Structure formats: structure tokens, C-alpha cells
Amino acid sequence: MEQFYYVLKYLILGLFQGLTEPIPISSSGHLVLAQHLLGLKIEGFSFELLVNSASLLAVLLIYRNDLIRLTKNGLSYIFTRAEDAKSDFFFIIYLVIATIPAGVIGVLFKDYIDQYLKGVKMVGISLLITAVGLWIIRNLRGRKNDGDLSMKDAIIVGLAQACALIPGISRSGATIVAAMLLGMKQETALRFSFLLYIPVSLGGLLLSITDIANDPNLDTLFVPYVVAFIATFIMTYISLKWFMNIMAKGNLKYFSFYCIIVGVLTLIFL
């Protein structure tokens, strides 16, 4: 019975992570709230890495054609300087540049963030900040395509992603808001945001391999972890496909409304 409870608990959290990871409402913030409301305590550091890896796998699957094209054209430009591959080569460079701020800040301030910025009230405040950003860009229609991006764009979007280390600040929301304020088209902002998710997640996973291997709960929670991984992967895939349709229709304001409601309720009642 206890094993069933653990499986059910991790199934719920896996579905929750998968649903909230792609959409701009902060998956990390919602996991904090879910654990608080349900009285759940996650045993071990591996769980967060596990579900992030599942979400990463779903993103890789959805953007596999973009990744293949970028890799092919990036290598082509390096060796042949083919003009038609230039924009993809620099798109890769800008992704690398945009990855740096979150990587550096995450390494330097991880302990501080874990200790002081993961409280429920902080999540409520951060959700309200996310709501404001989404409201500001609700009617924006930029003109920049992949080939129009600059180093300045990459740095600013990278700094926005670093802000999302705070639970309640949505990573996808922060990067899409920054990208659209810089004049990117919605589809360009969305693609840059989720392709940027890949190196950040891979980096975090590689840096934490030893934590996973040494997790004392890995043996006892193996089945619940597997269930959570599968649930997160499936739900992330569905949620990201849905969010891509929402972005195409320009309905980001509804996520703003949601973040306001949850943020206010969190500050009042939790």
C-alpha cells in the first residue's frame, strides 16, 4: 500500500511537471505549491533532475527537425562558408551565448536560491511578475526572424532566463517576453526559447550526475521515479504542442490572468 502511495504521488507530480514546464506559468513554482498544498515531501535531489530530463526528451523530440537542420547548416557554414547556412550558424552561436548567464548564476547562487527564494510567498510574488510580463507582450507582433537576431538579443534573453532560476518566474515566459520585447516574431521567440532550454537542461543534468548516482532513495523509489519520468515526458509533449497552438493564436493574455489569480491566492491564503 505504501508503494502504491509513492507511485501515485510521483505520478501526480510528474503529470504536474509535464503540464507546467512548457507553458509560461512556472513549473518550479507550481511544484513548490503542489508539495505545500498536498503535504508532499520529495525525498532526494534526483526527482527534479529526473522530471527535467523527461521534459528535455520531449522538447528534443518536438524540435528534432530544427536541431538536425541547425547542426547540418552549422557544420556546413564552418567548412564551406555557404551563405545560405550563415543564419543557422549564428543562431547556434546566439543560443550558446544566451545559455551562459543562467549557467554562471545558477552555479554561483544555487545555495542562496535554494535557501531563501523557494518559499511559497516568493512563488506568489514571482507569479505576479510573470503575469505582468505576459500582459505587456499580449498584442506584440515582432518582425525579427532567425536571421535577424544579434548578440545583444542573445544576451538579454539569456539574462531573462537567469531570472527564471527563481521559482515562480517562468523560464519560457521570461525568455519569450524578452524575445518579443526585442522585436522577434512569435514563432521565432518560441523556437529560440525552447531550443535554449536544451543546453541549459543538459548542463544541469551533467553537473548533477554524481548527485543522482549517490541519491540514497534511488533504490527504494526506482518504480515511482520511472512512473514520474514517463508521465512527465508524455504530458510535456502534449502541453508543448498545445502551447505552440496558443502562441500561434496570440492568446498569451490567458496565462497572464492565470498567474495573477494563482499569485494573489498564494499570497493571501498560503
UniProtKB/Swiss-Prot annotation:
Keywords assigned by UniProt, alphabetized: Antibiotic resistance, Cell membrane, Cell shape, Cell wall biogenesis/degradation, Hydrolase, Membrane, Peptidoglycan synthesis, Transmembrane, Transmembrane helix
Species of the source: Bacillus cereus (strain ATCC 14579 / DSM 31 / CCUG 7414 / JCM 2152 / NBRC 15305 / NCIMB 9373 / NCTC 2599 / NRRL B-3711)
EC number from the UniProt entry: 3.6.1.27
Keyword Cell cycle set for record: no
GO terms, biological process: cell wall organization; peptidoglycan biosynthetic process; peptidoglycan metabolic process; regulation of cell shape; response to antibiotic
Transmembrane segments: 5-25, 42-62, 89-109, 117-137, 192-212, 220-240, 250-270
Record has Zinc-finger as a keyword: no
Superkingdom of this protein's organism: Bacteria
Protein name, per record: Undecaprenyl-diphosphatase 1
Major location category of this protein: membrane
Entry similarity comment: Belongs to the UppP family.
Gene designation: uppP1
Location in the cell: Cell membrane
